């Protein structure tokens, strides 16, 4: 359903905060549907899972089976977390757009899961009312989609069903919710709005427009789409192939037919060339027959070659550079800079970087010089790094990370 890149977080009850799972690192997190019965053995349509796999070593960092009663919290545009029973998971996204896309897919999966779990309970409601109330799932509640979740609970759950809420929903009076639920049950037939296509994204957008705490986030996410229709409406596609861009941009619309009449005579010579085979071949063939693809390491677009690889990638694994770092014992210099010359956040510059702006450059180079006396192999880093650079420029195998196309 969706695939994003984020850092998987876990709740630390001892400190009361969130910590990265497995030492951190970006993971490929996806919401997907698994065919077959759920582990509980309830629904027949299949179940939905949230699966996370770290890009660095393909290690599974997140495995969560979705069930009704999930409580979703949106702390800020790029950090969301949810709880399911005693389990708590969190994700730190790279952009608000990816976070919004993940939340919409999660809402869609839970809406489909709720409809699937309500089907058997509605058929057995006439025989055993107690089973109907026991099988009724708790709807999803979140900071952003509180209105849509309340309308979802009004139409699918009885007035006495428990509703999972979050701390931000305390601003609403609790006494008015059963009354609104009864009135909606009397005026609208149950389950009718949910018999068609799932509409979690539309309800989310509607809740954002009426939002009680997410109006800023909704305006931020929806601020981009309006410009593309304006740009498409102002361009004239009819004159793009005739080369009359100057007349379309500067001249009035009345003067545009003149270039068309002048361009009409060259049109007949263009028709005969498609008949012979040799002429259209140079026009259709691109210089290197390359296609645009997305890199699996940095998620950037690149021109894919015949071997499926592209240019240099800073985040791609580089065995040659790793060998240079190990042979020169560069980790000793990094450890020295981290423990002695790092800032308040624990960041430090590269040991061999000559970039200006360091607060204590003299102390930094003096410490590295003293360390090189104790670890002489540090002096080999410069020539080894130069050899690696030459090998990467020559295209030697194992030297220099390259863009690789993501698996489809």
UniProtKB/Swiss-Prot annotation:
Residues 265-281 have a biased composition (Pro residues). Transmembrane segments: none annotated. Residues 118-226, 256-286 are annotated as: Disordered. Residues 192-242 form the KBD domain. It is a peripheral membrane protein. It comes from the Eukaryota. Brain specific. Residues 294-405 form the SPR domain. Keywords: Cell membrane, Lipoprotein, Membrane, Methylation, Palmitate, Phosphoprotein, Ubl conjugation. Gene3D superfamilies: Pleckstrin-homology domain (PH domain)/Phosphotyrosine-binding domain (PTB). Its main location: membrane. Interacts with palmitoyltransferase ZDHHC17/HIP14; the interaction leads to palmitoylation of SPRED3. Tyrosine kinase substrate that inhibits growth-factor-mediated activation of MAP kinase. Inhibits fibroblast growth factor (FGF)-induced retinal lens fiber differentiation, probably by inhibiting FGF-mediated phosphorylation of ERK1/2. Inhibits TGFB-induced epithelial-to-mesenchymal transition in lens epithelial cells. This is Sprouty-related, EVH1 domain-containing protein 3. It comes from Mus musculus.
């Amino acid at each position: 359903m969706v695939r994003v890149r984020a850092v998987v977080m876990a709740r630390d009850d001892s400190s009361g905060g969130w910590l990265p799972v497995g030492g951190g690192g970006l993971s490929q997190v996806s919401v997907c549907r698994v065919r077959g019965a759920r582990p509980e053995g309830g629904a027949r349509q299949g179940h939905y899972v949230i699966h996370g796999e770290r890009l660095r070593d393909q290690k599974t960092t997140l495995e969560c089976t979705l069930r009704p009663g999930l409580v979703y919290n949106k702390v800020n545009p790029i950090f969301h977390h949810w709880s399911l029973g005693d389990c708590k998971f969190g994700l730190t996204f790279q952009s608000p757009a990816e976070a919004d896309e993940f939340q919409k897919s999660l809402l869609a999966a839970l809406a489909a899961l709720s409809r699937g779990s309500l089907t058997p309970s509605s058929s057995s409601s006439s025989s055993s009312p107690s089973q109907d109330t026991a099988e009724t799932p708790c709807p999803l509640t979140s900071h952003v989609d509180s209105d849509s979740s309340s309308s979802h609970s009004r139409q699918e759950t009885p007035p006495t069903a428990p509703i999972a809420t979050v701390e931000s929903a305390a601003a609403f009076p609790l006494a008015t919710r059963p009354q609104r639920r009864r009135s909606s049950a009397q005026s609208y037939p149950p389950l009718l709005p949910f018999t068609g296509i799932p509409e979690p994204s539309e309800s989310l957008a509607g809740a954002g427009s009426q939002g009680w705490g997410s109006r800023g986030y909704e305006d931020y996410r929806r601020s981009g789409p309006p410009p593309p229709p304006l740009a498409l409406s102002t361009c004239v596609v009819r004159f793009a192939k005739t080369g009359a861009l100057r007349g379309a941009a500067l001249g009035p619309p009345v003067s545009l037919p003149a270039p068309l009449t002048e361009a009409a005579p060259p049109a007949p010579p263009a028709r005969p060339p498609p008949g012979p085979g040799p002429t259209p071949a140079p026009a259709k063939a691109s210089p290197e027959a390359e296609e645009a693809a997305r890199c699996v390491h940095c998620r950037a677009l690149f021109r894919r070659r015949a071997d499926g690889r592209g240019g240099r990638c800073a985040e791609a694994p580089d065995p040659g550079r790793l060998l240079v770092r190990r042979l020169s014992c560069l980790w000793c210099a990094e450890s020295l800079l981290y423990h002695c010359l790092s800032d308040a956040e624990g960041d430090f510059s590269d040991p061999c970087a000559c970039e200006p702006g360091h607060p204590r450059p003299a102390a930094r180079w003096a410490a590295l010089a003293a360390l090189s006396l104790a670890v002489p192999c540090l002096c080999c880093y410069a020539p080894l790094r130069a050899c690696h650079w030459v090998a990467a420029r020559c295209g030697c195998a194992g030297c220099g990370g390259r863009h690789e196309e993501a698996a489809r």
